[in-house]
Amino acid sequence: MQLTEQQHDKLSKVQLDESWKHSLAEFLVSSRMDELRQFLIEQKNQDKVIYPPSKQIFNALNTTPLSAVKVVILGQDPYHGPNQANGLSFSVQKGIVLPPSLRNIFHELNTDLGIPVPKHGDLTKWADQGVLLLNSVLTVEAGQPTSHQKRGWEQFTDSIIDVLNEQREHVVFILWGAYAQRKGQRIDREKHLVLKAAHPSPLAANRGGFFGCKVFSKTNNYLKQHGIEPIDWQLDA
């Protein structure tokens, strides 16, 4: 699309990896994004605490450029507790107690690949290798789960999925739970691999359908079949 001078100026102020910025430009300069920005400004003006910190809102995109994406793990919205969210879905800062969903993910990782259960929950190493850890909604108010849903983030992250769907091939989309699976209906199964399972939260996982899903080995097998370097899922101590 042809951008006006005003739109170019607006785009230049977005602190986002250039490959993503270029591909998402149409949304980033849209009225929907303006409304989302205004909502976040109003929240901060009301002294509401927003997670993750503003510099980490686009952490998933800035850590995993468009050309590097091999895998997408789609979450819902960020953790809403202090010092948990770091802009990567399911990930928490080092030194933070593992949330139940992440404990279950690590349990499945251990069962699937025999990898020792990590002692911390910082998934940056995965993101550095091409695992886009993307939440559907990128911000949340402290202590208020789902508080920033239906404010525009969903359309933004739909655009991210559309860009990957159209511009890339042989990406593995890991969709845990009904919410992620609905969002993933737009993915072209001819070009990409979609792996579905129950959500790793204790409530969902204990009903069955998560443990034993073997998404980690299935992901690496698919990548290797297409000549793509597999993911080293083992996290540093």
Curated annotation (Swiss-Prot):
Primary localisation category: cytoplasm
GO BP terms in the entry: base-excision repair, AP site formation via deaminated base removal
Gene3D superfamilies: Uracil-DNA glycosylase-like domain (3.40.470.10)
Enzyme class label: hydrolase
PROSITE patterns assigned: U_DNA_GLYCOSYLASE
SUPFAM superfamilies: Uracil-DNA glycosylase-like
E.C. no: 3.2.2.27
Compartments in which it is found: Cytoplasm
InterPro entries given in the database record: UDG_fam1 (IPR002043), Ura-DNA_Glyclase_AS (IPR018085), Uracil-DNA_glycosylase-like (IPR005122), Uracil-DNA_glycosylase-like_sf (IPR036895)
GO cellular component terms, A-Z: cytoplasm
A single MF term (Gene Ontology): uracil DNA N-glycosylase activity
Family: Belongs to the uracil-DNA glycosylase (UDG) superfamily. UNG family.
Function per UniProt: Excises uracil residues from the DNA which can arise as a result of misincorporation of dUMP residues by DNA polymerase or due to deamination of cytosine.
Protein name: Uracil-DNA glycosylase
Source organism: Acinetobacter baylyi (strain ATCC 33305 / BD413 / ADP1)
Lineage, uppermost ranks: Bacteria, Pseudomonadati, Pseudomonadota, Gammaproteobacteria, Moraxellales
Chain's gene name: ung
